[in-house]
């Protein structure tokens, strides 16, 4: 996770948690002159639109005061959804056994994209089984990771 994302996570997580939600993760996507700050919230009973609105109001207030992002951006608050992104080793461990899609920042063992069964974590590595081969992917090399929902 980049230092900018770590800074945003550290700023926003206490606000989200004070409202009774888990701050699942934060993404900042630069899109030219206009960017998107996406905050994922979760709780055991699920997330409703009213929850997103309440968190958005509080987070927006903190962002206005602290002003950690230069330039224009849109704030989006949502649940992680069925294809939830994974950000932390704890999240990867919690979802062991599920299908995942992982994209690395740069190639590792000759490839950048991995899709397979999440086996868990070992120290600072995410373990994924792809075509009967187990890969240990350093958490710091992961650009994006998502659960692949099953519909069976």
UniProtKB/Swiss-Prot annotation:
Entry GO terms, CC: cytosol
One Pfam family named in its UniProt record: RimP_N
Keyword terms of this UniProt record: Cytoplasm, Ribosome biogenesis
Disulfide bond residue pairs: none
Example GO biological process: ribosomal small subunit assembly
Subcellular location per the Swiss-Prot or TrEMBL entry: Cytoplasm
Alphabetized HAMAP family for the sequence: RimP
Name this polypeptide is given: Ribosome maturation factor RimP
Gene name linked to the record: rimP
């Amino acid at each position: 996770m980049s230092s900018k994302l770590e800074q945003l996570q550290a700023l926003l997580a206490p606000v989200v948690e004070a409202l009774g939600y888990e701050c699942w993760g934060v993404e900042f996507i630069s899109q030219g002159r206009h960017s998107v700050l996406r905050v994922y919230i979760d709780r055991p009973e699920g997330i409703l639109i009213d929850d997103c609105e309440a968190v958005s109001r509080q987070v927006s207030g903190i962002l206005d005061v602290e002003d950690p992002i230069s330039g224009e951006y849109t704030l989006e608050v949502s649940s992680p959804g069925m294809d939830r992104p994974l950000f932390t080793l704890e999240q990867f461990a919690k979802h062991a056994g599920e299908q995942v899609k992982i994209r690395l920042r740069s190639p590792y063992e000759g490839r950048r994209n991995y899709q397979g069964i999440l086996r868990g974590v070992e120290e600072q590595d995410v373990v994924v089984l792809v075509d009967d081969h187990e890969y240990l992917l350093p958490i710091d090399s992961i650009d994006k990771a998502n659960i692949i929902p099953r519909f069976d």
